[in-house]
Amino acid sequence: MKKVKVCSPGTSANLGPGYDIFGLALSKPYDILEVEKTEKGIIISVEGEKAEEIPTNVDENTAGVVAKKMMEDFNIQSGIHIHINKGIKPGSGLGSSSASCAGVAFALNELFELKLSKLELVKYSSLGEAVAAGAPHADNVAPAIFGGFTLTTSYDPLEVLHIPVDIEVLVALPNIQVSTKTAREILPKEIPIKYMVNNVGKAAGMVYALYNNDLELFGRYMSKDCVVEPCRANLIDGYAEVKEKVKDLVYGITISGSGPAIITIPKKEHVIDIENIFKEVWNCPVYYTKVGPGCYVEEIE
């Protein structure tokens, strides 16, 4: 095997009360990564969404950091060329950096037949997230690897729970810049216990709703975060207006990851109405998609 081509999905993390725990893999948008064996070194090339803003230096690129660590750990002597076709806009709140991290970990596992488990791939992938967010975290890379709905319940040791689900979502991507680091820094270091009780209860209710295929309950609890969303809402102009306008058209709405992307669980009969509101307020791209698989191989040479 000389070359592998991998599809790595966009993801939505947090989902309201599940901060740094919950994640969903999306069928679109997605990145395509091609990893090819070379004689030596790691070369990175990028095309697609905001490609000119993505560093190709190995130690500054999320995929590069992951690849370097894996190649060191497994004493891989050959070089590689990583080509990333970005379909996920960086800084969107849809797991753009995570797609690169997970995609390259998955590709190297295939290319060099490392036989790593999905959990081990999540662990390696999360290391690259430190470049984008300042610290390793797995709430995006876990669904990018596992697909479906994931819960990262522990970091030391790393534990990920996976639930296959069939949910349609409607995502808006406002043309607003939100820094992941800034969005994390503005969060409170301590919260009242009543807020903890609310979020734990709502997060538990969301898992219950998934097992009972109850979209109404899932969406209602997704919209009830009282810790993270209130802090980040002001970073997204128009969010309060949109939330009010779509409240009767969706089962739930919240900020995707750090934002600015907004994820909704739409009532099917109102999808077009919601899209029109998104475009009226933000004039932005909209994705009507569903929860999808994790990384998968498209081609092998």
Swiss-Prot record:
BP GO annotations: threonine biosynthetic process
| Keyword Nucleotidyltransferase in annotation | no
EC number(s) reported in the record: 2.7.1.39
Domain of life of the source? Archaea
Positions bound to ATP: 89-99
Q: What is its main location?
A: cytoplasm
One Pfam family in the UniProt entry: GHMP_kinases_C
Q: Which InterPro entries match?
A: GHMP_kinase_C_dom, GHMP_kinase_C_sf, GHMP_kinase_N_dom, GHMP_knse_ATP-bd_CS, Homoserine_kinase, Ribosomal_Su5_D2-typ_SF, Ribsml_uS5_D2-typ_fold_subgr
What is the annotated localization of this protein? Cytoplasm
Q: Which GO terms describe its cellular component?
A: cytoplasm
Q: Does the keyword NAD apply?
A: no
Pathway named in the protein's UniProt entry = Amino-acid biosynthesis; L-threonine biosynthesis; L-threonine from L-aspartate: step 4/5
GO MF annotation list: ATP binding; homoserine kinase activity
Name of the protein = Homoserine kinase
Q: Which organism is it from?
A: Methanococcus maripaludis (strain C5 / ATCC BAA-1333)
Q: What is the lineage of its organism?
A: Archaea, Methanobacteriati, Methanobacteriota, Methanomada group, Methanococci
